[in-house]
Structure formats: structure tokens, C-alpha cells
């Protein structure tokens, strides 16, 4: 912000009024920058290797979910290690009881989205399947979706993203909830 514009503001923001030397070497700041760019990796017995993405405040990794590799994202405050622990603990609770959560998420998505899947099927001119005589059932819907990613927050909220098996022409099926309240939402994403 230019100095002449900032002078009339009640709260004056920082502004650069002059650059004395461009590209000045500063060993102290260089050391801070190098430390910032060092990778932060956590090894967890349940969740495996998790790497901090400082740009997005997430730890990223892969887990086994019902026999399949699934991406895991832990939403954290990169500057707050307690948030790392809370997010890891929440994710471990999901993973430890994954069969129960997987069935509940699939059933919830099927209950809430099967009608919409049949609506999309009726609009698919290339499909030989008639939703009037051979509709997608809730059981079929639940079996067809494939979990690809789980995102977990420190507070125990989670969102699971499923491949739609082209029932929605490539959109993801998104299922959200929390460890305390259970599954609360299912919709399309992407």
C-alpha cells in the first residue's frame, strides 16, 4: 500500500516506502527459510507415514481401508502440534473401526443418493439400462462406490470421497460426519 493512502487509515498497515537493496543476503532469514523447507514426516503405527504439506496445513499419507489403498489427509494447524495429535487420534479411531464406518458411510450414501443416481441414469442416452425396469438399488449403489480419500480434522470431523463408478458421470460421492454425531451428509462433489 502506498504511504499516502495509508496515512488516512485508522489502523495503519505495514507498507514499503522504499527498497534500499534488492536481493540482500541475510543469513538469519536464510536459516529460517531453510528450516521451513525441511520436510516434516511422522511415522505412526496405525496410519503409516504422514508428510506435512505446509501450504495447505495438512498431513498427507496412504492407509489401508478394507483392503484397498486410500489417501488420508489430516487437517491441522501446522504451527500447533496438539492439533496434529488430535487429528491423528481421530483418524486412528476411524481406521481402527473401519469396517463399521465403511458400511455406515456406504449405506448412508446409498439411502440419500440412489434416487438421484436413477435420475441421472434416466438422462443417460448412451446407457442401455432403463431405470424404470432395472433401477439402481441401494444395495447396488453401496457396492459400486469405491473409497478414494478420507479427510479428518482435529475435532473428529471427517469427509470420505468415493469414486462414483460413473453413476454420476465421474463426480465424486462425498460423505461427511463426525466421530461424535456419526454420518450427517452425503452429496456429489467435483
Show the residue positions of the predicted features.
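Broad gene-expression machinery/nucleic-acid interaction feature
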Residues: 6, 10-14, 58-60, 69-71, ...
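Beta-strand elements of well-folded, non-transmembrane domains
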Residues: 3, 67, 78, 164-166, ...
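OB-fold/S1-family single-stranded nucleic acid-binding modules
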Residues: 2-35
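N-terminal start-of-chain detector that recognizes signal peptides
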Residues: 43-47, 130-134, 145-149
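Long, charge-rich alpha-helical interaction segments
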Residues: 81-136, 141
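Contiguous hydrophobic, core-forming segments of folded domains
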Residues: 36-104
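Generic low-polarity alpha-helical segments
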Residues: 1-3, 98, 177
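C-terminal structured interaction module
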Residues: 138-190
Amino acid at each position: 500500500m502506498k504511504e499516502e493512502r495509508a496515512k488516512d487509515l485508522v489502523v495503519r498497515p505495514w507498507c514499503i516506502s522504499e527498497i534500499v537493496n534488492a536481493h540482500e543476503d541475510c543469513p538469519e532469514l536464510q536459516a529460517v527459510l531453510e528450516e521451513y523447507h525441511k520436510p516434516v514426516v511422522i511415522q505412526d503405527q496405525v496410519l503409516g507415514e504422514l508428510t506435512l504439506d505446509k501450504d495447505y496445513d495438512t498431513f498427507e499419507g496412504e492407509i489401508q481401508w478394507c483392503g484397498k489403498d486410500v489417501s488420508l489427509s489430516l487437517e491441522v494447524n501446522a504451527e500447533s502440534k496438539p492439533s496434529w495429535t488430535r487429528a491423528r487420534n481421530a483418524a486412528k479411531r476411524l481406521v481402527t473401526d473401519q469396517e463399521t464406518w465403511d458400511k455406515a458411510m456406504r449405506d448412508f450414501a446409498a439411502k440419500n443418493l440412489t434416487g438421484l443416481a436413477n435420475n441421472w441414469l434416466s438422462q443417460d442416452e448412451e446407457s442401455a439400462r432403463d431405470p424404470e425396469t432395472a433401477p439402481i438399488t441401494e444395495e447396488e449403489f453401496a457396492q459400486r462406490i469405491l473409497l478414494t480419500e478420507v479427510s479428518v480434522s482435529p475435532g473428529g470431523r471427517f469427509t470420505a470421497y468415493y469414486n462414483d463408478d460413473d453413476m454420476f458421470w465421474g463426480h465424486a460421492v462425498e460423505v461427511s460426519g463426525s466421530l461424535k454425531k456419526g454420518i450427517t451428509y452425503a452429496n456429489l462433489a467435483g
